[in-house]
Design a protein with these regions (language model features):
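Long, intrinsically disordered low-complexity tandem-repeat segments
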Residues: 339-377
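C-terminal helix-rich "cap/oligomerization" subdomain common to oxidoreductases
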Residues: 1-8, 34, 74-77, 306-346, ...
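Contiguous beta-strand/loop segments that form the cofactor/metal-binding neighborhood of enzyme cores
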Residues: 194-269, 298-337
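Predominantly a Rossmann-like dinucleotide-binding segment in NAD(P)-dependent oxidoreductases
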Residues: 131-217, 322
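Rossmann-fold dehydrogenase core element
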Residues: 113-130, 151-153
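Beta-loop-alpha module in the N-terminal Rossmann-like domain of NAD(P)-dependent dehydrogenases
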Residues: 54-117
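N-terminal Rossmann-like dinucleotide-binding module
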Residues: 1-54
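Hydrophobic residues in well-ordered beta-strands that form the structural core
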Residues: 20, 60, 100, 125-127, ...
Length: 407
């Protein structure tokens, strides 16, 4: 019984807005071995209301007070990106495991600071790129890994969104305030797309682009056009226009292979279209989403943290793929994902499963946040695929695509 208590993940939530209320917090209380121990909001009354709604025993209106709570052993940072670095550094210094909302920070340097702090403190760092664990994205990975569309050649992202003048001009809309978000809607939305492509195709080695503000509704960029190349050799292009006509609203990713093509939306539906030379008539897979969309990812984080705690917070040998673009002192993410399959059935020729390793590679680190270790052949592969290192790569690519920091 005492051992089970030692494995309990007791969350402290900092920031409890709409994302937290719907996508993540309820899941934390539903997952075995996980519970919310405390919540913090700047307005005490709102914190108290949130605590009452989710049966949370303690609430705070000060982040430092929550971080000092001895019952909290993991912190979920659900504030705008502008405060992610500061709060992550404080959480790491307090010895708390960290799960931070996406995008990870406003820029790549802040991401690196967060990784370094967690490495020095010896605590895990995870980022809320939850799409990696959803059934539609697991099906995409399964199909690609099984070679159903052959060798992947290229990828194109197209996103057109019309303006919403009242909301876009709202001072409370932090997503278009660079000092709070790092950029505009591109940073908020494209980060999901670029993160998944990193997971699917490996790290990007080159990226460049141009960005501008066409509608002058807010300070951040509202159109981005760019190109990128992955370590695997796949080339990609993207166009993100947040000033488009309503009649041309679009959201589609096209992944072209030597034997077929996959197409799917990021936000406009939960389906995947497949066409191959062998089966030219399109096959559409439909998927049901979990009630709380972050739950599959949070489940993997809880299980991984429990493993870490059972090993007395020592290094667990894990495989990972080291990108050339990151400093040698930083450990990388693991290459595996949690076992499971998509809800929709695959075509007859889609052999394989979504829990296979992404890519081969040498390993000399655990990949939590960078502590030393080893990874021999046959060692357990990480359950959680979304770490500080993978998320930092996404920030790096976004900076290059917007022309802020060329790669």
């Amino acid at each position: 019984m005492e051992k089970d208590k030692d494995k309990q993940i007791c969350w402290g939530i900092i920031g409890a807005g709409s994302v937290c209320r719907v996508k993540s917090a309820p899941a934390m209380n539903k997952i075995p071995g996980s519970r919310i121990a405390a919540v913090m909001r700047r307005t005490g009354e709102k914190a108290r209301e949130f605590a009452a709604l989710h049966n949370i025993p303690r609430w705070y209106d000060d982040a430092d007070a929550l971080l000092s709570d001895p019952d909290v052993n993991a912190v979920y940072i659900a504030t705008p990106p502008g405060s992610h670095r500061e709060l992550t550094l404080k959480a790491a210094a307090a010895g708390k495991s960290v799960y931070v909302e996406k995008p990870m920070a406003r820029n790549w340097q802040e991401c690196r600071d967060m990784i370094s702090a967690c490495k020095e403190a010896g605590v895990p760092l995870f980022v809320a790129y939850y799409r990696r664990m959803l059934p539609n994205y697991r099906k995409i990975k399964e199909l690609v890994d099984a070679g159903v569309i052959g060798t992947v050649r290229s990828v194109h992202i197209r996103m057109n969104k019309p303006v919403n003048p009242d909301f876009d001009r709202d001072p409370g809309n932090w997503r278009v305030q660079p000092e709070l978000a790092g950029g505009g809607y591109f940073y908020d939305l494209a980060s999901h797309q670029l993160d998944f492509l990193d997971y699917l195709l490996g790290p990007a080695t080159d990226a460049c682009g141009i960005a501008s503000n066409q509608a002058d509704l807010y300070p951040a960029e509202d159109i981005v056009t760019g190109s990128f190349r992955f370590e695997s050799g796949v080339q990609g292009t993207g166009n993100w226009c947040f000033t488009a006509a309503k009649s041309d609203e679009d959201d589609l990713i096209t992944l072209t292979g030597s034997k077929g093509v996959l197409r799917w939306p990021t936000f406009a539906g939960y389906y995947v279209d497949l066409k191959t030379d062998a089966k030219p008539d399109a096959i559409r897979f439909h998927f049901d989403m979990p009630e709380h969309i972050q739950q599959p990812l949070i489940e993997t984080i809880v299980r991984e943290l429990q493993d870490w705690m059972v090993h007395d917070r020592s290094d667990i040998p894990l495989k990972y793929k080291a990108p050339d673009s990151m400093e040698a002192s930083a450990a990388d993410d693991a290459t595996g994902e949690m076992a499971g399959s998509a809800d929709a059935a695959g075509p007859a020729d889609s052999a394989g499963s979504a829990d296979s390793a992404d890519s081969a590679g040498s390993a000399d680190s655990t990949g939590f946040a960078g502590s030393a270790g080893s990874a021999d052949s046959g060692d357990e592969v990480r359950r959680c695929p979304s770490t500080g290192i993978t998320a930092a790569r996404t920030n790096r690519v976004m900076e290059a695509l917007t022309g802020k920091n060329p790669m």
